[in-house]
Swiss-Prot record:
It comes from Mus musculus (Mouse). Pfam families: BTB_2, Ion_trans. Residues 404-415, 416-423 dip into the membrane without crossing it. This is Voltage-gated potassium channel regulatory subunit KCNG4. Keywords: Cell membrane, Ion channel, Ion transport, Membrane, Potassium, Potassium channel, Potassium transport, Transmembrane, Transmembrane helix, Transport, Voltage-gated channel. The chain crosses the membrane at residues 217-238, 260-281, 293-312, 327-351, 367-388, 431-459. GO terms for cellular component: nucleoplasm; plasma membrane; voltage-gated potassium channel complex. It is a multi-pass membrane protein. The gene is Kcng4. PANTHER family: POTASSIUM VOLTAGE-GATED CHANNEL SUBFAMILY G MEMBER 4, VOLTAGE-GATED POTASSIUM CHANNEL. It comes from the Eukaryota.
Length: 506
């Protein structure tokens, strides 16, 4: 009699890990030899075209979704809590129909209106002792089938059990999110009923600013925001051209420089207005300033106003000897603040699902990125002294002047960038370089797989949430339109026959 999955786990000679487990490479176990005819003696599929087998007390005939199986009662002895095994204890037709959908007393055939594919896998487990998930069936639906037939899900193979547990966690998380959304909707509906005109206007403003899919105002607002971000990026790039830099160095401001300033002022005015609108509609003002995108907005907008304040200041008459150093400091501050304008590009994350996925992946993979930095730090600390010693012992031109100076070479080599500014010339140094490059490839590959899977999962999750929100909005719109039609029909019913419109009735 073959062992079940639980028995094989307890038996040291029958340990078997799924293909998904990395331990299968470290501890390969031999597959047990199959006994010819063992499966047929424990379970047998009977075709519909075959003659019905004779009813006896040693076998049970099961019909699941039109597929018939013949199982000896001895096969079910190892599973006394299963649904099929409990049929053996039934003494009346009423007890039998409580466990199955129908029963034919002449042929002693039990009928079940269940998934035949899932039952085929369960029959294979009853006969051969190996339970796996059905690829073409949802894991949660297969779990329901296991619960119906009285088979514990812990009998699944390790790889399939991990997959099922992962699906259960995802389903639980989705239910929690849906419950939170329903709670928010109930609170929003309750607040809308009791809200004043100001609250309703704030809700409309929130939908326009935060949700581009809420309607035409939201789409127009999002398009304008993206347009101004693109305009700011273009103006920033144009302002760094040699002609503009030469004018800036001379302290002159021609018409072209003036146009760039006007474009930047218009964009900053729009961004300031958008920031104020987001702040006004935010229910929690403190939580608003903690948002990462709002912090980016502040860092991107503030340099413009600070640069205006700094440029308006001038040294007093008594400080004329140090005016040159003062102007140099002011110019440095202006250049640094001007470079911060590139943060406007990060505002696109409000309207881009890909950028939102990237930010969510970085937040979820903080541990993986930390491990990557740790691996790189250890490897750089290892290879920098080696290449320094190898190159200094050769007695050639010294490019590696010190161990800290070799850190740059180690980082560039391990990330496979290879600028070529520092190149080992000796054979030992080249061997160290080869080792560092190979180590860098392996180190970068270890967390890359986990980060990629997290990115893919986060993208699908955000896309699913967006589709759910859009579907919910469509349902609300359909519900509102249906309610309006019902209201109009009720009003028409109230109008007397001699009148044609509610206005005339009034």
């Amino acid at each position: 009699m073959p062992m079940s999955s639980r028995d094989r786990d307890l038996h040291p000679g029958h340990h078997h890990f799924g293909s998904c487990s990395p331990l299968s490479q470290l501890w390969p176990g031999p597959e047990p030899k199959s006994v010819k005819g063992l499966y047929y003696s424990r379970a047998r599929k009977v075709g519909n075209q075959d003659a019905s087998p004779e009813a006896n007390l040693k076998e049970i005939l099961v019909n699941v979704g039109g597929q018939r199986y013949l199982l000896p009662w001895s096969t079910l002895d190892a599973f006394p809590l299963s649904r099929l095994s409990r049929l053996r204890l039934c003494r009346s037709h009423e007890e039998i129909t409580q466990l199955c959908d129908d029963y034919d007393e002449d042929s002693q055939e039990f009928f079940f209106d269940r998934n035949p594919s899932a039952f085929g896998v369960i029959v294979s487990f009853l006969a051969a002792g190996k339970l796996v998930l059905l690829r073409e069936m949802c894991a949660l639906s297969f779990r329901e089938e296991l619960s119906y037939w009285g088979i514990e899900e812990t009998n699944l193979e390790r790889c399939c059990l991990r997959k099922l547990l992962k699906k259960l966690e995802e389903a639980a998380e989705l239910r929690r999110e849906e419950a939170a959304q329903r709670q928010q909707q109930r609170q929003a509906c309750h607040s809308e009923v009791q809200a004043s005109r100001w609250a309703r206007s704030m809700n409309q403003l929130r939908e326009m600013v935060e949700d581009p899919q809420s309607g035409l105002p939201g789409k127009v607002f999002a398009c304008l925001s993206v347009l101004f971000v693109a305009t700011t990026a273009v103006s920033l790039c144009v302002s760094t051209m040699p002609d503009f830099r030469a004018e800036e160095g001379k302290g002159e401001c021609t018409r072209k420089c003036y146009y760039i300033f006007v474009v930047e002022s218009i964009c900053v005015a729009w961004f300031s207005l958008e920031f104020c609108l987001r702040f006004v509609q935010a229910p929690n003002k403190c939580q608003f300033f903690r948002g990462p995108l709002n912090v980016i907005d502040i860092l991107a907008i503030s340099p413009y106003y600070v640069s205006l304040a700094v440029s308006d200041e001038s040294p007093e008459a008594g400080e004329r000897p140090s005016s040159s150093s003062y102007l140099e400091k002011v110019g440095l501050v202006l250049r640094v603040l001007r470079a911060l304008r590139i943060l406007y590009v990060m505002r696109l994350a409000r309207h881009s699902l890909g950028l939102q996925t990237l930010g969510l992946t970085v937040r979820r993979c903080a541990r993986e990125f930390g491990l990557l930095m740790l691996f790189l730090a250890v490897a750089v600390t290892l290879f920098s002294p080696l290449v320094y010693v190898a190159e200094n012992e050769s007695g050639r031109v010294l490019e590696f002047t010190s161990i800290p100076a070799s850190y740059w070479w180690a980082i560039i080599s391990m990330t496979t960038v290879g600028y070529g500014d520092m190149v080992p010339r000796s054979v030992p140094g080249q061997m160290v370089a080869l080792s560092s490059i190979l180590s860098g490839i392996l180190i970068m590959a270890f967390p890359a797989t986990s980060i990629f899977h997290t990115f893919s999962h986060s993208y699908l999750e955000l896309k699913r949430e967006q589709e759910q929100v859009q579907a919910r909005l469509r349902r609300l719109q359909n519900t509102n339109s249906a309610s309006e039609r019902e209201l109009l029909s009720d009003v028409d019913d109230l109008v007397p026959e001699g009148l044609t419109s509610p206005g005339r009735y009034m």
